[in-house]
Amino acid sequence: MRKKVLITGFDPFDKETVNPSWEAAKRLNGFETEEAIITAEQIPTVFRSALDTLRQAIQKHQPDIVICVGQAGGRMQITPERVAINLADARIPDNEGHQPIDEEISPDGPAAYWTRLPVKRMTAKMKEHGIPAAVSYTAGTFVCNYLFYGLMDHISRTSPHIRGGFIHIPYIPQQTIDKTAPSLSLDTIVRALRIAAVTAAQYDEDVKSPGGTLH
């Protein structure tokens, strides 16, 4: 039975004119394989409404799997995230000027949630297709981590049958014309997210393989 996969991306923030997470996600809207049917929704880069928008999308689409995607300018690889932390600590304001500092996302929630996606399998599959990828162990403390933590808190409390997680992606080339920062083509990012969605639909459990970081 094919799995319904919801992929989300953010609108542009921090003076950018595009956000590759949404540019990639919307290309996958309506994509179907033997394993998965993908729908896409845009999320505002706003602490107060990001999670509300995601909850509405989950209610609308009734997915089996949720993959939230965000821009991580400066990263060189596609990075599926392993853990979300219960902290909002914004270096810059969000798109409505909110800048929470040292605030808990959920006062009665745990310190962290693990992803429910097979991130090591996803990373390995991307590499098999020539796409630079690595498991990440920090999703930051801005709206990306806020949404990731909020997603996991929501499904843990209300929809334990849903598997969810987060993937960070690099800039696309048009964003780096005036920056000394790495980028990946939008086509490559779209391929990576398609591989991630199909892999998540195929495998409920992750593989035990060497990973982690030394620092």
Curated annotation (Swiss-Prot):
GO molecular function term, any single one: pyroglutamyl-peptidase activity
What biological-process terms (Gene Ontology) are attached? proteolysis
Query: Member of which family?
Result: Belongs to the peptidase C15 family.
| Catalytic activity, reaction form | Release of an N-terminal pyroglutamyl group from a polypeptide, the second amino acid generally not being Pro
Please state what class of enzyme this protein is: hydrolase
Transmembrane intervals: none
Q: InterPro entries, alphabetically?
A: Peptidase_C15, Peptidase_C15-like, Peptidase_C15-like_sf, PGP-I_bact-type, PGPEP1_Cys_AS, PGPEP1_Glu_AS
* Main location group: cytoplasm
What are the EC numbers?
3.4.19.3
Q: Which domain of life is it from?
A: Bacteria
Q: Does the keyword Iron-sulfur apply?
A: no
What are the catalytic residues? 81, 144, 168
What is the name of the protein in this document? Pyrrolidone-carboxylate peptidase
- Summarize subunit and interaction data from the UniProt record for this chain: Homotetramer.
> What are the alphabetically sorted keywords of the record?
Cytoplasm, Hydrolase, Protease, Thiol protease
Residues forming coiled coils: none
Stored Pfam families: Peptidase_C15
Looking at the UniProt record for this protein, which Gene Ontology cellular component terms does it annotate, in alphabetical order? cytosol
Name its cellular compartments.
Cytoplasm
Function as written in the Swiss-Prot or TrEMBL entry: Removes 5-oxoproline from various penultimate amino acid residues except L-proline.
